[in-house]
């Protein structure tokens, strides 16, 4: 028998990286929020690699922080190492990556959730949704508890009908041998959702005390203090290194010999795996010309001897995994503490979602994270904060928030999912963003803090600091535009020292900074400011002046795109009534139901001729409505 267990504005199912951001965002915006999770000990658990950030992903963490989310602050408090990647490349592809103390990461985030007003965290497995007349009204748990809500967010990760696979061993399980969620998956199918089967995997963990580090290469963190959050002022300087080793020809021979025992190659696994995180079996087969592959040894925390063997994700049986580890330099005598495994799980086809992450089929129901077909903690958290924001907005009667492709990587991620769908676990890459020069690591706050403040996630004190920073950047840029640096001996000497051409005449400080060999630090020496300019402001001034021409070109492209985005498509449009559209385009348009002509133009199978016909039809419809009035 069921019983009434309470009423909420927002209910979040799951407390992984998507669920944590969704629950915190909704509660901080003033919605009475309930987070339900199968196991309270697994809040913010990292079932795979103990790290946050990296190319594109690190920028997402900055964006979450700029909106008022928690991931950046939490990793800043709990990392064991931090590095800026791609420092030799342009600012568009630079990204921060941190190694996490995964246990401390969990502990700190759970503590934050427990201490957040308006937020209740409870253990319980949701088996069904309460749906009336196509509207989600709440959830029912395994124990019969019925919780009603104005909105519900599903963030179930890889738990939906999860199955762990190692060799010919296969059993029903969530990640790390947790209880899977089977009934909810079946219920979503009953409600008419189209589900797909995806697969991911994880490598073995080994005991640090049994590694011969003398045969590996040290990978230290950066000496310069770094942080993901724009709020962080205390930095962890006591860092722990990672270590680099490689597979050997013996490793590859062993894998080839046992390929028939890999679940990936025996036919045991039916789900599609992630393209950009292949198993070691895949790497050996697909890149058989490579004599070795990189293996990174990543400590899982400060108070554990467990080491994550990055690059060795596998579904080979346990006995082969043990042998395989011993063929790697430094791991000849290693003790395996946990086996690697593959996991298959259900995901929904994401074209069934609106750009707000609300499902098209059921009103007031949102989904975020791996259930939407993505891979990665950061992608999940980015969707989680947006689903939480929009679920809260709906519950509070406010306008929902949609980030565009020129606003954030989160916008690129969600637009790709809901417009194009995905036939494999989706990973965010810098190459997916056409405006990546605008979507940089360094300017996430300038892009998104105002949105976070407007919806109530950025407090006044933080917004005031942001406004001062923005003003300082503009003032310093204007100062450098107005200062003339003359060819004095000390100026010529500095320019010569960095390999530049000497000045013939006076030059504006901003123009001198545009030279590739010059930095803001050089300009500061030649034309010091009376005000103290901090590093964040200096970085912005340098990037905005140096890349001004390229940024201007990107902004012009954005303006053209926004014209297409501003041409809205009526939600109730009848695509069958539009003659001349190709049948594939008609089918895709009916499936995705784009909200704008811009979104329609990004659907695969919809070509420019179809867009032209659609534009004419919409314009004619507007004319007809006006003439009827």
UniProtKB/Swiss-Prot annotation:
InterPro entries: FAD/NAD-bd_sf (IPR036188), GIDA_C_N (IPR049312), MnmG (IPR004416), MnmG-rel (IPR002218), MnmG-rel_CS (IPR020595), MnmG_C (IPR026904), MnmG_C_subdom (IPR047001), MnmG_C_subdom_sf (IPR044920). FAD binds at residues 14-19, 126, 181, 370. NAD(+) binds at residues 273-287. GO terms for biological process: tRNA methylation; tRNA wobble uridine modification. GO terms for cellular component: cytosol. Keywords: Cytoplasm, FAD, Flavoprotein, NAD, tRNA processing. The keyword Cytoplasm applies. The keyword Flavoprotein applies. Its cofactor is FAD. GO terms for molecular function: flavin adenine dinucleotide binding. PANTHER family: GLUCOSE INHIBITED DIVISION PROTEIN A (PTHR11806), PROTEIN MTO1 HOMOLOG, MITOCHONDRIAL (PTHR11806:SF0). HAMAP family: MnmG_GidA. NAD-binding protein involved in the addition of a carboxymethylaminomethyl (cmnm) group at the wobble position (U34) of certain tRNAs, forming tRNA-cmnm(5)s(2)U34. Homodimer. Heterotetramer of two MnmE and two MnmG subunits. Belongs to the MnmG family. This is tRNA uridine 5-carboxymethylaminomethyl modification enzyme MnmG. The gene is mnmG.
């Amino acid at each position: 028998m069921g019983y009434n267990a309470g009423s909420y504005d927002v209910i979040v199912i799951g407390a992984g990286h998507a669920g944590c951001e969704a629950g915190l965002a909704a509660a901080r915006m003033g919605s009475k929020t309930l987070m339900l999770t199968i196991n309270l000990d697994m809040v913010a658990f990292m079932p795979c690699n103990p790290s946050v950030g990296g190319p594109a992903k690190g920028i997402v963490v900055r964006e979450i922080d700029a909106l008022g989310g928690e991931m950046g602050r939490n990793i800043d408090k709990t990392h064991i190492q931090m590095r800026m990647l791609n420092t030799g490349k342009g600012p568009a592809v630079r990204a921060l990556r941190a190694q996490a103390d995964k246990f401390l990461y969990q502990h700190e985030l759970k503590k934050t959730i427990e201490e957040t007003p308006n937020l209740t965290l409870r253990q319980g497995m949701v088996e069904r949704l309460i749906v009336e007349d196509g509207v989600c009204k709440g959830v029912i748990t395994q124990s019969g508890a019925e919780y009603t809500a104005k909105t519900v967010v599903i963030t179930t990760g890889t738990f939906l009908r999860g199955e762990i696979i190692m060799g010919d061993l296969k059993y029903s399980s969530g990640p790390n041998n947790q209880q899977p969620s089977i009934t909810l998956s079946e219920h979503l199918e009953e409600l008419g959702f189209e589900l797909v089967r995806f697969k991911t995997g994880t490598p073995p963990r080994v005991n640090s005390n049994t590694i011969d580090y003398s045969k590996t290469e040290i990978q230290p963190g950066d000496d310069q203090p770094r942080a993901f959050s724009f709020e962080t002022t205390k930095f962890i300087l006591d860092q722990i290194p990672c270590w680099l080793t490689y597979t050997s020809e013996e490793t590859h021979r062993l894998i080839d010999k046992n390929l028939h025992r890999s679940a990936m190659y025996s036919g045991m696994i039916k789900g599609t795996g992630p393209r950009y995180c292949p198993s070691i079996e895949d790497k050996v087969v697909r890149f058989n010309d490579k004599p070795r592959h990189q293996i990174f040894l990543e400590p899982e925390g400060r108070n554990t001897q467990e080491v994550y063997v990055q690059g060795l994700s596998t579904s080979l049986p346990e006995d082969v995994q043990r042998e395989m580890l011993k063929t790697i330099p430094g791991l000849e005598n290693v003790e395996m503490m946990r086996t690697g495994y593959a996991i298959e799980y259900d995901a929904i086809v994401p074209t069934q979602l609106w750009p707000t992450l609300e499902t098209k089929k059921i009103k007031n129901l949102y989904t975020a994270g791996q259930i939407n077909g993505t891979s990665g903690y950061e992608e999940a958290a980015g969707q989680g904060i947006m689903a939480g924001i929009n679920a809260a907005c709906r519950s509070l009667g406010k306008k929902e928030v949609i980030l565009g492709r020129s606003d954030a990587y989160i916008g690129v991620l969600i637009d790709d999912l809901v417009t194009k769908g995905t036939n494999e676990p989706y990973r965010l890459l810098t190459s997916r963003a056409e405006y990546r020069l605008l979507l940089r690591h360094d300017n996430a706050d300038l892009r998104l803090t105002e949105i976070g403040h407007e919806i109530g996630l950025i407090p006044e004190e933080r917004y005031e600091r942001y406004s001062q920073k923005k003003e300082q950047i503009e003032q310093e840029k204007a100062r450098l535009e107005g200062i003339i640096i003359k060819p004095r001996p000390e100026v010529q000497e500095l320019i010569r020292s960095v390999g530049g051409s000497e000045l013939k005449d006076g030059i504006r400080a901003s123009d001198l900074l545009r030279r590739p060999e010059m930095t803001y630090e050089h300009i500061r020496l030649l034309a010091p400011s009376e005000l103290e300019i901090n590093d964040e402001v200096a970085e912005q001034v340098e990037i905005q002046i140096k890349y001004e021409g390229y940024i201007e070109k990107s902004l012009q492209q954005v303006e053209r795109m926004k014209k297409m985005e501003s041409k809205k498509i009526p939600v109730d449009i009848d695509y069958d009534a539009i003659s001349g559209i190709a049948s594939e385009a008609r089918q895709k348009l009916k499936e995705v139901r784009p909200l704008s002509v811009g979104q329609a133009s990004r659907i695969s199978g919809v070509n420019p001729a179809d867009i032209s016909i659609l534009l004419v039809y919409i314009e004619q419809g507007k004319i007809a409505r006006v003439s009827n009035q």
